[in-house]
């Protein structure tokens, strides 16, 4: 029953025309094993990157059955630096050249191709023109660091190299799982299918809400901005959205219309002429010329306009509408900018107008969320 429910959840992605396969982000080996049980099918052709020929590889091979195929890939390394036990049992996966009686232990030689690569980049040669149904990726094992940008880059390249789109990608990565738990598709927020907690703390791991189009971008304001908040719009252009943010923060929370709160709002953009126009049209709002990537300057905007101590720096909510990042391309650049803003400004939430980020919010799934949903049924 659980398998039927979760496979239906994943198949909803593939039912959408031209929709990319879901990326299932797992934070632990236990979650990976559960995801394999629920998303991988008998007879599947699966690539495992970062195969350690241990429990995960065993579970994968059992799941695909004798009619399935698995390409298990790892990079060559010394036992002393790999974190592995030197006496790990590879017999079920690698044929022995030693003569003697056959072993009675379980063997997967009928379905496994094991590749130990001299260089990490060689993994691409195993994917081009192939038609894998799935990939299981252990980011930390494969590249040595658990970085979600690397995980998404590898997943994207794997998809692009396939002759036919894979059905699912399962990734073991705590950082990617963390991102998946924080990213909220704008439509789910606006239609009420995702309800945020009443109280969100400011943090370097804020909620991220990607939007498509300026109307959707502005419609999120009542859901995320409170009276008395400190808010900045990065990429304010001529300042129209900034004025809406300004109106939202100056209203006293719980007060009557027109009652003034103590919030702060500013808009920044890299274009001096744009900012000059915004200042002329909306003189009551703080506008400054600032590059979005200069996060220290974003902090200085508030410091220069408010008599606050260092502990009060940063913002409750950040809105971002950056030229070059709002379209279908620039995903890794968008994530890098969001990461820089989050670490420097520590907001509760970041709203970004970006089609590529919105698509990621549709594709990236925190396995913990899916499992919790199934557990409660």
Model-found features: residue ranges?
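C-terminal substrate-binding/active-site "lid" region of AdoMet-derived donor-dependent transferases
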Residues: 141-202, 324-377
């Amino acid at each position: 029953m659980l398998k039927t429910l979760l496979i239906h959840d994943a198949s909803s992605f593939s039912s959408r025309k031209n929709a990319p396969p879901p990326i299932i982000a797992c934070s632990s080996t236990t979650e990976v094993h559960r995801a394999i049980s629920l998303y991988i099918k008998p007879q599947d052709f699966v690539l495992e990157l970062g195969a350690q020929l241990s429990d995960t590889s065993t579970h994968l091979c059992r799941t695909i059955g004798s009619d399935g195929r698995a390409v298990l890939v790892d990079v060559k390394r010394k036992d002393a630096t790999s974190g592995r036990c030197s006496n790990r049992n590879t017999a079920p996966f690698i044929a022995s050249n030693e003569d003697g009686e056959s072993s009675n232990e379980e063997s997967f030689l009928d379905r496994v191709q094991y590749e130990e690569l001299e260089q990490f980049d060689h993994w691409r040669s195993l994917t081009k023109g192939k038609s894998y149904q799935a990939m299981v990726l252990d980011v930390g094992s494969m590249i040595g660091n658990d970085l979600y940008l690397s995980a998404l880059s590898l997943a994207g390249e794997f998809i692009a190299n396939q002759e036919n789109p894979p059905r699912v990608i399962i990734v073991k990565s705590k950082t990617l799982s963390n991102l998946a738990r924080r990213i909220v598709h704008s439509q789910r927020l606006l239609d009420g299918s995702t309800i945020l907690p009443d109280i969100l703390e400011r943090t370097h791991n804020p909620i991220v809400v990607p939007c498509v189009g300026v109307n959707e971008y502005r419609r999120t304001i009542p859901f995320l901005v409170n009276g008395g908040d400190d808010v900045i719009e990065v990429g304010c252009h001529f300042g129209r959205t900034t004025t809406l943010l300004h109106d939202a923060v100056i209203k006293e929370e719980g007060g009557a219309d027109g009652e003034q709160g103590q919030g702060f709002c500013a808009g920044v953009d890299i274009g001096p002429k744009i900012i000059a126009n915004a200042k002329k049209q909306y003189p009551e709002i703080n506008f400054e010329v600032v590059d979005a990537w200069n996060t220290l300057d974003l902090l200085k905007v508030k410091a220069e306009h408010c008599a606050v101590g260092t502990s009060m720096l940063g913002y409750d909510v950040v809105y971002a509408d950056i030229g070059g990042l709002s379209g279908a391309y620039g995903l890794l650049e968008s994530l890098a900018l969001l990461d820089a803003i989050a670490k420097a400004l520590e907001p509760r939430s970041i709203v970004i107008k970006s089609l590529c980020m919105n698509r990621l919010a549709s594709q990236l799934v925190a396995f913990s969320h899916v499992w919790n949903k199934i557990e409660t049924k």
